[in-house]
Amino acid sequence: TVLNLDIVAKVVMKLLPEKGPYVLSMDRTNWKFGEENINALVIGITYKKVAFPILFKLLDKRGNSNCEERIEIMQRFIRLFGRESIACLVADREFIGEEWVKWLNDWCIEYHLRVKENFWVEDPRTGEEKRVKSMFIHLKDKQELVLHRIYRIKGQLCYLSGARLKNSDGVPELQILISFSRPDLALSRYKERWQIESCFRGMKSSGFNIEDTHLVHLERVEQLFGVMIISFTWAYLVGIKKDIEVKAIRILKTGNRAISVMKYGLEHIASVL
């Protein structure tokens, strides 16, 4: 029996603890078995420090996704749930390209995408070009700047905003974003992007251990992914309920939970099966 992945996405959407419109986070995850590379482009719906994976596309290649693949997965989301269900889309520096940003602009989809510091930006009023980094280089640590004029990057008109923030290694770096509209929201919205990485950790090592399956045939991996998406959502919802109604998850001195909500729910499900 072949699992219908559109139905999987609709089931997950029905199970979500909040109704839309939603902040979508697009990212890519990969794992390797010997010489085999499994590469997945994923759209997740962000919610309280996690992202629920809703759609994915397995890429039969190594490396980044291309514009066509990103457009295809977004078109699928719109076909299933409607454009009105999208509050905005956030994505990292990998997800930039003229054709891609043009498609988002044409569909009037609010987005907040990070760009590389060395990109050229043009002022459409004067034709002046400069590196986008030069517009934010003066920012001090934790300082933010929103530019309320429209600029052109990669041939497309957009708004710009930026901040100097510490990266995962604790080193301050510029975070520069392009937006379709509402640049004032860009930096706060973009903070939700990392929630999809929590989802990937749950899939890989913090719960489902997908890499231990050693599946390499894309058709089989695709079916497993579909089952795992439903299971991930179910485990998270059980974890929320148990945390609230049965026993709260212990909070560490750092302020973090001793165990993730998803893993808390997964362990409970495993104990009763």
Describe the role of every protein-language-model region.
Residues 2-10, 17-22, 33-36, 47-273:
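Single, function-defining residue in the core of a domain
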Residues 27-40:
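An active-site-proximal beta-strand-loop segment
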